[in-house]
C-alpha cells in the first residue's frame, strides 16, 4: 500500500463546535494521543514511504503538545496543519512560527460572516509575512452560493490566489455541485478534494482519528482501530476496509444533498 500522505486528528476538542463537523468536535473534546505516540507513529510511517503529515482536529492549536510534535518532526517529512484561527495570535502565533511548520491553512467555515473572512485574510497574510507558507480552506454550501462567491473574491483580491485556496464542498447535505464550486472559484483552475466528482478511496491517503482509528477519508464513518501505532498497523487497519459515502439523501428537512453511493471495498 503506497501511502504518501496521512492526516492525523490530534483531538476532537474545538471551541468553535460547528454543527456540521465530521469529527463531532466540542469545546470539552478529548484526545487519546500522547506526544511520544504521535511522533513515534509518524516517524515509522515516514521510514516506510509516507512523505507528508497533516494535523487537524478538532482544533490542533488546542492540543497542548502540537508545537513539540512539529519541532521533533522537523526534517522528517512535510508537516502541515489546518486551524480555525481563533487562537492564532499572540504567544500561540509566535510559538507556531517558531515550530516551523511547512504549511498552515486557516479555515473559512462561514463565508457569509464578513468578520471571519477579514480575520482569516489577515492571519494568512501575516503567516506568509513571517515566512510560513499559508493558505485558506474555504467551505462552500449550496444554499449560500452568493455569499461564498463574494467572500472568495475578497480572498483572491487580498492576494491569496487559487493556488493557496482549497475549496471544500459541504458534505452530508447542502452540497454544491462541482460546477457551482467552480463558479465560487472564479471559473479558473482550483484545488478541492480528490473525491469532488466521484466517491472512492485514494491508495496514497489515510485519515487517522483522535481515537486512533483509521479510514480512507476524514468524512466517512467506515473506520477501524489501529492494531499498533506503526506503519504496519496502519496498513493492517486499511486493508479490506470499505468506504461509506459521506453524503446524505434528499429529504424535506434540509437543502438538496448528494445521493448515497454503495460501499467501495
What are the functions of these language-model segments?
Residues 4, 30, 36, 44, ...:
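Acidic-enriched, low-complexity/disordered segments with a strong bias for Aspartate over Glutamate
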Amino acid at each position: 500500500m503506497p501511502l504518501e500522505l496521512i492526516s492525523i486528528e490530534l483531538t476532537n476538542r474545538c471551541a468553535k463546535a460547528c454543527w456540521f463537523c465530521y469529527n463531532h468536535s466540542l469545546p470539552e473534546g478529548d484526545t487519546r494521543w500522547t506526544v511520544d505516540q504521535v511522533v513515534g507513529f509518524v516517524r515509522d510511517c515516514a521510514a516506510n514511504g509516507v512523505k507528508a503529515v497533516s494535523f487537524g482536529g478538532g482544533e490542533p492549536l488546542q492540543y497542548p503538545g502540537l508545537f513539540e510534535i512539529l519541532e521533533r518532526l522537523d526534517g522528517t517529512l512535510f508537516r502541515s496543519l489546518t486551524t480555525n484561527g481563533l487562537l492564532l495570535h499572540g504567544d500561540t502565533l509566535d510559538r507556531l512560527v517558531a515550530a516551523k511548520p511547512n504549511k498552515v491553512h486557516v479555515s473559512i467555515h462561514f463565508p457569509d460572516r464578513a468578520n471571519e473572512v477579514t480575520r482569516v485574510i489577515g492571519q494568512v497574510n501575516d503567516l506568509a509575512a513571517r515566512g510560513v507558507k499559508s493558505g485558506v480552506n474555504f467551505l462552500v454550501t449550496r444554499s449560500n452560493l452568493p455569499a461564498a462567491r463574494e467572500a472568495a473574491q475578497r480572498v483572491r483580491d487580498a492576494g491569496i490566489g487559487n493556488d493557496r485556496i482549497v475549496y471544500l464542498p459541504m458534505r452530508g447535505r447542502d452540497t454544491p455541485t462541482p460546477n457551482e464550486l467552480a463558479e465560487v472559484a472564479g471559473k479558473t483552475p482550483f484545488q478541492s478534494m480528490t473525491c469532488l466528482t466521484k466517491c472512492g478511496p485514494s491508495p496514497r491517503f489515510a485519515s487517522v482519528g483522535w481515537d486512533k482509528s483509521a479510514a480512507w477519508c476524514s468524512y466517512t464513518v467506515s473506520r477501524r482501530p489501529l492494531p499498533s501505532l506503526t506503519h504496519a498497523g496502519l496498513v493492517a487497519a486499511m486493508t479490506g476496509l470499505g468506504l461509506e459515502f459521506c453524503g446524505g439523501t434528499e429529504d424535506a428537512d434540509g437543502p438538496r444533498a448528494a445521493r448515497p453511493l454503495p460501499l467501495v471495498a
